[in-house]
Amino acid sequence: MTILFISDLHLSPLRPDITDCFIDFMQNEAIHAEKLYVLGDLFEFWIGDDDNSPFNVLVKNEFKALTKKGVKCYFIQGNRDFLLNKRFCKETGVELLDDHTVIDLDGEKVLIMHGDTLCIDDIKYQEFRAKVHKPWLQWVFNRIPLFIRQRIVKNVQDKIKEKKQTKTLCIMDVTQSEVERVMQEEGVQRLIHGHTHRPDTHTFISNDKEMTRIVLGDWYSQGSILEYSDKIYSLHKKEFK
């Protein structure tokens, strides 16, 4: 049994190298897996399931082809694609999961998430996240004409770039106390997440138990894949062609 995890691809028409790497992964690696989990930020920005641009259709077709081959695909919303919803899933066969989801891997309970909720020291971001995740606000936003939403998102992108330059690295990383709190609350000893773009495996002791936190990498300069097979977790790099 092989299960794959990816996150933070930030797919965009402006980065055909990432797109090519993603398509190669879907057609030559994911096709041989039993399950594929996408833990958020698949897209650089997703402004609504009604955006059927040629690029979005291209990506959706890759998932549709994969699920039709019998590979189960799951998606957790990230901070860039939290508006990806039921229509996308219906069109592709992908199953949308809760922000915090516990899965069973050979009898072990494993918590999976995007990871942005763990960065509680970034107070401004958490306040922004709370606002944009309000159901009524998303309902209103999704009913704004598509071309206006595109302008709004472009403005938001520019502001995000400006703010990132002023934030310290520690603020943009997870808060260890929050990691431990969430893992204890969910009753797990293993956590898999993305968001921080810092692929690594961290082990620590909490309440006399050994805990493991696996961080997925981004796809900015190369692909990053976590493979689970025969109870072994392996982080792999995938070079751009």
Curated annotation (Swiss-Prot):
Gene3D superfamilies: 3.60.21.10. Binds 2 Mn(2+) ions per subunit in a binuclear metal center. GO terms for biological process: lipid A biosynthetic process. Mn(2+) 2 binds at D41, N79, H114, H195. Belongs to the LpxH family. NCBIfam families: lipid_A_lpxH (TIGR01854), PRK05340.1 (NF003743). It comes from the Bacteria. It is a peripheral membrane protein. This is UDP-2,3-diacylglucosamine hydrolase. Substrate binds at N79, R80, D122, K164, K167, H195. Mn(2+) 1 binds at D8, H10, D41, H197. Pathway: Glycolipid biosynthesis; lipid IV(A) biosynthesis; lipid IV(A) from (3R)-3-hydroxytetradecanoyl-[acyl-carrier-protein] and UDP-N-acetyl-alpha-D-glucosamine: step 4/6. Its EC number is 3.6.1.54. GO terms for molecular function: manganese ion binding; UDP-2,3-diacylglucosamine hydrolase activity. GO terms for cellular component: cytoplasm; extrinsic component of plasma membrane. The keyword Calcium does not apply. The keyword Cell inner membrane applies. Its cofactor is Mn(2+). It comes from Aliivibrio fischeri (strain MJ11). Hydrolyzes the pyrophosphate bond of UDP-2,3-diacylglucosamine to yield 2,3-diacylglucosamine 1-phosphate (lipid X) and UMP by catalyzing the attack of water at the alpha-P atom. Involved in the biosynthesis of lipid A, a phosphorylated glycolipid that anchors the lipopolysaccharide to the outer membrane of the cell. The gene is lpxH. It is an enzyme of class 3 (hydrolase). Transmembrane segments: none annotated.
